[in-house]
UniProtKB/Swiss-Prot annotation:
<protein>
    <recommendedName>
        <fullName>Putative heme-binding protein rrnAC3100</fullName>
    </recommendedName>
</protein>
<dbReference type="InterPro" id="IPR010644">
    <property type="entry name" value="ChdC/CLD"/>
</dbReference>
<feature type="region of interest" description="Disordered">
    <location>
        <begin position="260"/>
        <end position="351"/>
    </location>
</feature>
<dbReference type="Pfam" id="PF03992">
    <property type="entry name" value="ABM"/>
</dbReference>
<dbReference type="Pfam" id="PF06778">
    <property type="entry name" value="Chlor_dismutase"/>
</dbReference>
<comment type="similarity">
    <text>In the N-terminal section; belongs to the ChdC family.</text>
</comment>
<dbReference type="GO" id="GO:0046872">
    <property type="term" value="F:metal ion binding"/>
</dbReference>
<feature type="binding site" description="axial binding residue">
    <location>
        <position position="181"/>
    </location>
    <ligand>
        <name>heme</name>
    </ligand>
</feature>
<keyword id="KW-0479">Metal-binding</keyword>
<feature type="region of interest" description="Disordered">
    <location>
        <begin position="451"/>
        <end position="477"/>
    </location>
</feature>
<dbReference type="InterPro" id="IPR007138">
    <property type="entry name" value="ABM_dom"/>
</dbReference>
<dbReference type="InterPro" id="IPR011008">
    <property type="entry name" value="Dimeric_a/b-barrel"/>
</dbReference>
<dbReference type="GO" id="GO:0020037">
    <property type="term" value="F:heme binding"/>
</dbReference>
<keyword id="KW-0408">Iron</keyword>
<keyword id="KW-0349">Heme</keyword>
<feature type="domain" description="ABM">
    <location>
        <begin position="579"/>
        <end position="667"/>
    </location>
</feature>
<dbReference type="GO" id="GO:0016491">
    <property type="term" value="F:oxidoreductase activity"/>
</dbReference>
Length: 669
């Protein structure tokens, strides 16, 4: 048999149809705080990809999916397969992804083939690039996802049976089939849009077909007519069909609430972040932005995508100021121009009535926030004192922080405690952004003293940060070498050290255990997670949550979630001193009491040592033989004096017989 002639083809954008189901049971059981964060991250992901912040060009859209096969479908079109690969894995890093399961996916590339006489002229280079035909083919290869309400996606292949083998037919016969098939499709051109993507070698079928229409009956009528065409009846095989409806990322809360979408804003369920916006952040009448509408408190775009650093395709680049400088700013109506601050509109009072100070960096240092770790030189900080207890305002501040995070000039906002006093700290890369944030922070319960100041100069600050980092690394290495010489590591390589975070909480044990159980389930999705445990003292006065990670980056990311736990009053070891040495011990059950007595003895010695602040023995709520010791010191010199002492060496030697596992020592400074 003669070799059959394949058609010429040209490829355009790569396509990924990512179909996911929602774990509805897990969603219903999740705490509201977790659901709010998941929605915020889901909206943020979809907004960023619809704005094509990740590539030079492309398209992204999201749809509900009806039936049992999936609940949502995310469609990505990008110039390279690498873009699709990154997008798929990026989604998995969001909190929202934890509530989804990928039920089906399809990888393909938009395709135009040279079966018709006109298209063959294009492939043979006989038409100008600006001709109507060339522009039509390019539009097929780089399509705009239409705004039609309904989508229908399905994969298909050409039949390869002995008496019905598409690939054994002549080029002329195939071309005749394609022409007749195309004539049917053109008859529905005003009612149905299509995207044809080839997938030979990419996926299990040979093509992926995507159809859009404002009336699903038009798609049904089109496909019904095509089924009776010989090109389909004799040669087509079809995979599963996925039918859904397009929705805006901002409507993700409505989708998860079981509401009808598209929907107007009034019917979208409110999250605490939305409530915070209504109470603290009316529209910014005085702001001037490059687009008509700005992000809402949930991070969604109510109109065009946020502008700013846009490229020729209208997409924004990561790290640009595309979402505007002012937290919660939205387009306002004419009657808002008066500056009223009612819930119906108008800009809140952001007159920057805080006192300017010169020692902002020193104040942050006393609160455990240092240049290079918490901020960069040249940033601007607000430090507001509150007479309220930290645990009473942590939720409100967390809600505002979630809103602020949608603006790229925000660094961080958090509650800090020092010597029994409560502070709200908000750091921004520019003073004008901080001034606007002040208008919202001043409404936090109990706020009285309001201070703000620059955090040094950029160039000088970077040198200081480098020196600080070098000193910290030197300190850590020195102490680790001392511990190793005492045999603490029992031969374990330094590369197996873990990074630990500890937060203190005043919440009751039952509440804290429930919250940490939910958080631990989320952390366990990551290979870098070692353990997250609740520890408490025998009197029940102190509770700590310790989270251990294989990498420092993972620990830093986890810290944001730990501070969201109820009743958090500060991160242990943050302050103006050297910090905390954290020691994790698993004791053999028969030596439990002996270990506690030994700790009491060593604790008495520590009280007499210069520079010692506090050392606490805490027990795992689930296993009393799993213990955590937190030892805080004023300086490296003070800590080294103890770790080099004979008393410490004797304690280490004694511990070899009573410990069920090797001790784990980590620095929390």
């Amino acid at each position: 048999m003669d070799q059959r002639k394949p058609p010429a083809t040209e490829e355009g954008w790569y396509a990924l149809h990512d179909c996911r189901s929602i774990d509805w049971d897990a969603w219903r059981e999740a705490p509201q705080r977790v659901r709010d964060r998941a929605l915020s991250e889901g909206i943020g992901f979809l907004d960023a990809y619809e704005a094509v912040e990740d590539a030079d060009e492309g398209q992204t859209a999201v749809y509900t999916v009806m039936g049992h096969k999936a609940d949502i479908m995310i469609l990505h079109l990008r110039p390279t397969m690498g873009d699709l690969d990154a997008a798929e894995r990026h989604f998995e890093q969001t909190e929202f992804a934890a509530f989804t399961e990928q039920e089906f996916s399809y990888v393909s590339v938009t395709e135009a083939s040279g079966y018709t006489e006109k298209s063959r002229e294009y492939f043979e280079g006989e038409v100008d690039d600006d001709s109507g035909l060339a522009q039509y083919i390019q539009a097929r290869l780089h399509p705009d996802v239409p705004d039609e309400e309904f989508v229908c996606f399905y994969p298909m292949s050409k039949r390869r049976q002995p008496d019905q083998n598409w690939y054994d037919t002549s080029f002329e016969e195939r071309a005749a089939h394609i022409k007749r098939h195309g004539d049917i499709g053109r008859g529905y051109g005003s009612e149905v849009s299509q995207m044809i993507a080839g997938s030979i070698g990419f996926d299990d079928w040979e093509w992926g077909i995507t159809l859009w229409s404002d009336d699903m009956r038009h798609i049904k009528e089109l496909l019904t007519e095509m089924r009776f065409d010989p090109s389909t009846s004799q040669f087509a095989e079809f995979g599963p069909f996925y039918v859904g409806r397009k929705f805006d990322p901002s409507e993700l809360p409505a989708v998860l609430a079981g509401q009808r979408v598209p929907t107007d804003d009034a019917s979208v369920p409110e999250t605490p972040a939305d409530v915070a916006e209504h109470e603290h952040a009316p529209a910014d009448a005085g702001a001037s932005h490059s687009h008509a509408e700005e992000p809402t408190a949930s991070g969604a775009q109510t109109g065009a995508h946020a502008g700013g650093d846009t490229d020729s395709h209208g997409g924004t680049h990561p790290g640009s100021a595309s979402e505007g400088d002012h937290p919660h700013s939205e387009e306002s109506s004419d009657e808002d121009d008066s500056g009223s601050s009612s819930s119906s509109g108008g800009r809140p009072d952001v007159s920057a009535d805080f006192e300017e100070i010169d020692d902002a960096a020193q104040r942050l240092g006393r609160l455990g926030l240092h240049e290079g770790d918490a901020y960069d030189a040249g940033d601007y900080a607000l430090v507001f004192h509150s007479s309220a207890d930290a645990e009473d305002i942590v939720d409100d501040v967390s809600d505002l922080e979630s809103n602020f995070d949608h603006y790229d000039r925000h660094v961080q906002t958090a509650v800090r405690a020092d010597s029994g006093q409560t502070y709200v700290v908000s750091i921004w890369t520019a003073k004008d952004a901080a001034e606007t944030a002040a208008g919202f922070l001043k409404d936090i319960d109990g706020v009285d003293e309001q201070l703000g100041g620059s955090l040094g100069e950029g160039v000088e600050g970077s040198e200081t940060a480098d020196d600080s980092d070098a000193q910290a690394a030197e300190s850590s290495q020195s102490i680790r070498e001392t511990l190793e010489s005492a045999g603490v590591y029992a031969g374990q390589p330094h590369g197996e050290d873990v990074y630990a975070l500890v937060v203190y909480s005043e919440a009751n044990a039952e509440t804290l255990d429930e919250e940490v159980t939910d958080l631990r389930s989320a952390f366990e999705r990551y290979d870098t997670h070692v353990q997250t445990t609740v520890y408490g003292d025998t009197d029940g006065d102190v509770a700590a949550v310790a989270s251990l990670w294989d990498t420092e980056d993972a620990a830093q990311t986890a810290s944001d979630y730990l501070t969201d736990l109820p009743g958090v009053v500060g991160r242990h070891g943050e302050g103006d001193g050297f910090g905390t040495m954290g020691m994790f011990y698993t004791v053999k059950p028969e030596y439990h009491e002996d270990f506690v007595e030994k700790f009491d003895t060593v604790g008495g010695l520590l009280k007499e040592m210069d520079g010692h602040r506090e050392t606490s023995l805490l027990f795992n709520h689930d296993d009393e033989n799993d213990m955590f010791i937190a030892s805080q010191w004023d300086s490296q010199k003070d800590a080294m004096a103890f770790f080099r002492s004979d008393d410490f060496s004797e304690t280490v030697d004694w511990g070899r017989d009573v410990l069920a596992d090797r001790p784990r020592h980590v620095f929390l400074a």
